[in-house]
Amino acid sequence: MAKEEFPGWHGTTIIGVRKGGKVVVAGDGQVSLGPTVIKGSARKVRRLSPGGYDVVCGFAGSTADAFTLLERLEAKLEATPGQLQRASVELAKDWRTDKYLQKLEAMLIVTDGSELYIITGAGDVLEPEHDIAAIGSGGNFALAAARGMMDSDKDAEAVARDAMAIASDICVYTNGNLTVETISA
């Protein structure tokens, strides 16, 4: 699967599912360098707690770039406590206009349990439809699988885990070694 097939997307899969008063963010653990799997147990889903305000973030793309963005998001959340949308928009504005940040290659899914966003380097802060956010090379596979399960009796974690299992069966840059974080509304 050539990188050009998923412009701006990178070898991983992250999904956020909101259902039943909870949001679950799950990410696989595979790190690839070209056609080689370098690591199978990376943690691409993190919990931030600036000022006691819990936020769960998942990232696809360069790890160093993602950590830079997570640090900036945490600073924005400290400056605007309890306002995830505002902090996300401020991060996206900086990311798009700052010459240093423009070079960062990553995408983020962020949630505080009630709001769920995808943040991109193009300046987008997207609130996904159908209570599902998915990014990365296997994101479309996970998104389609999760949408097919949302009307079932499965809870948010089961939907996220099952969607990730399907994505890992299809996308060679995604494995089944998951990190899962749950946050309540």
UniProtKB/Swiss-Prot annotation:
Name of the protein described by the UniProt record: ATP-dependent protease subunit HslV
Keywords recorded for this protein, A-Z: Allosteric enzyme, Cytoplasm, Hydrolase, Metal-binding, Protease, Sodium, Threonine protease
Catalysis: reaction(s): ATP-dependent cleavage of peptide bonds with broad specificity
Subunit relationships: A double ring-shaped homohexamer of HslV is capped on each side by a ring-shaped HslU homohexamer. The assembly of the HslU/HslV complex is dependent on binding of ATP.
Binding site for Na(+): S168, C171, T174
Naturally occurring in which organism (per UniProt): Jannaschia sp. (strain CCS1)
Active-site residues from the entry: T12
Similarity comment: family membership: Belongs to the peptidase T1B family. HslV subfamily.
